[in-house]
Amino acid sequence: MTERGADTMTADTGNANCRELLDVMTARGLDTVVVSPGSRNAPLLIGVAARDELRKIIIPDERTAAFAALGIGLVTRRPVALICTSGTALYNYAPAVAEAYYQKIPLIVITADRPSQWIDQDDSQTLRQPGALDKIVKRSYDIPPETGMTSACTNPEYRSEREWFVNRIANEAYTTATSGQPGPVHVNMQFGNPLDETTPHRRRQVRTLEVIPNDAPLPPQLCRELALRLMGKKV
């Protein structure tokens, strides 16, 4: 018996943080991802491959990938995600990300990273990634491994504080990249082993948060309701 909503033909990443991040981003409108395959970003690669709504562009060289994403963003003025592995790979993004910052292009840079306890331990492909692009992005975010947040969440919509936190970061990153003066953001994701776990892909509803501009007109129906309430108010 197949669980309702499960697609037995498509394997999704077994990493819950990746699933939440990608589900929120696609629900908000992300439709194009430029990826540079590696080892540490395997959970992201599996997750992207499972989502048919995403246009995938695979470019092994990170510098070339970043400029390709920049070009797409310049033409479409829509958000484009960049995904790379850990280590020095993210610094190959820097020239294009700097250009995106000054051209006001909403690039969403997603970098895979080792868990923080492995940094500065002479482990291969590791460096201090959180904040590495701070001077050329609107904001940076760092998401700990799945096992880093296990406490229950006070919000009844979420099973754990981890799920709520990743949802919040995904929404905030997308909003920051696309609102006001658009620009790049950096989301660093820490992954521990194993990296290649999978689970059946399920389409699901996720919480999305959007900013309403201060000068946005109120819907006519709401204006009428407010007027009626004010007219009936006793002073």
Indicate residue ranges for each PLM-predicted region.
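N-terminal alpha/beta PP-like core and its mobile active-site loop of ThDP/TPP-dependent enzymes
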Residues: E3-V235
